[in-house]
């Protein structure tokens, strides 16, 4: 079992090796079982986590706050608008300040072409580990939860087919971080991963290449489809998700026009 995780940042899905991810999931299963049995596990007593949000959140905020409480620690919710960031505090300054006050820093910053760089700038200046609660490129913790659910529901995921399909939504251009993290992590576990989307909703080329490289190392397969029905055919796991056409346009109006062509997805 790989346990050399103390003090490590988790910003990209690839920051932890496959073996380290398996260790995290093993511990998570144990803690979930203990909680179901009423067994306390205050492993983070007297520890404090800063949760800095630039975007609203329901599930991520709730899960981090509940998790810290169940582990005996405290999660401090910090809306960026209530800080001095708007008055000039940089990522470096936030890293230096929060890194002194807190035992860990978790950040959600999803602005396109900004979020990941900001989180890394905080991490570079912080003496405490930095966790990515979603940026413009990755959403690693959500995908860990998804992977845990897959293990619980279907067992060993090797050889199972998952279809990650774009889904129409009339709201704003959502980040591409969820599908990108999905194809990165699922291809490390020997799954047959399908990415199904209209032509305008491509993901970042380097992320796609990493997913292909993972298949070469871990087995399984990876394919990109633009046929909605073909993506679902014979799949064991379905993962519909809306994301923006950000590699085609960052203009919200143009994005809405593109999306209106695919309301049946």
Task: Annotate each language-model stretch with its function.
Residues 36, 42-151:
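Phosphate/diphosphate ligand-binding glycine-rich loop within oxidoreductases
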Residues 54-66, 152-241, 248:
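Glycine-rich phosphate/diphosphate-binding loop of Rossmann-like nucleotide-binding domains
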Residues 3-9:
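Short, contiguous pre-domain boundary segments
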Residues 29, 54, 109-110, 242-244:
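Short glycine-/small-residue-rich Rossmann-like dinucleotide-binding loops
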Residues 10-42:
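An N-terminal, well-structured beta->alpha segment
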Residues 116, 171-176, 245-265:
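Glycine/threonine-rich flexible loop motifs
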Residues 28, 102, 234-235:
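Short, well-ordered alpha-helix to beta-strand connector turns
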Residues 5, 44-46, 157-159:
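Short, flexible coil/linker segments at domain boundaries that flank nucleotide/cofactor-interacting
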